[in-house]
From Swiss-Prot:
Record organism: Proteus mirabilis
Subunit annotation: Homopentamer.
Keywords: Bacterial flagellum, Secreted
Protein name: Flagellar hook-associated protein 2
Major place of residence: secreted
GO biological process: bacterial-type flagellum-dependent cell motility
Gene: fliD
A family per Pfam: FliD_N
Amino acid sequence: MAGISALGVGAKMPLGETLMQLEAAENKRLEPLDKQMKSYDAQITAYGKIRSQLDKLQKASEELKKFDKIVATKVDDEFDAFKVTTDGKASIGNYTVSVTELAHAQTLKSKAVSDIKDPIGETLGEGKTRTLVITQKGEKEPLKIELTDSQTSIIELRDAINKKEGNVSATIVKAQDGVNHLVLTSRKEGTDSQMEITVEGDSKL
């Protein structure tokens, strides 16, 4: 075909030199495209970094909304006698705690009884029971004890209460005048162990 010249044997131009010139020309033509590709790569990398920072900022913003989780202060020391906690509203500083009164276990006693084996409740009849309920604020459930007619003496009450192994212990104390009292004592100290005693089904006990 006209206009087409052959390279190689029979041609007067050096083949190697011609190929190098063609390659150089092609590389020069591709230089702008190569620069543009590098520019695109740099932009994509920059976008990725910006996106990563935005994700971190969004996560931090969501955490800032949860003010109840932000605590600006903390307690440095621990104490055996009491527990100290702080929150975000506490002012930074040193504090002194003075104990003016120690917590103690509550003790209750029954009315005086001459014979510890005498029933002090009503006679309900065979098969019927009454329920002794001891409520303490610090306990999840009140202590409930079902009692038959034969279990209303203070010695039987003592045994029934102790058998439950709750936060209340029962003992019998003999006074100087010879009378006896059923004494109930909370096993734990503090106001949460204060006892409230009621009897369901027996107005006399």
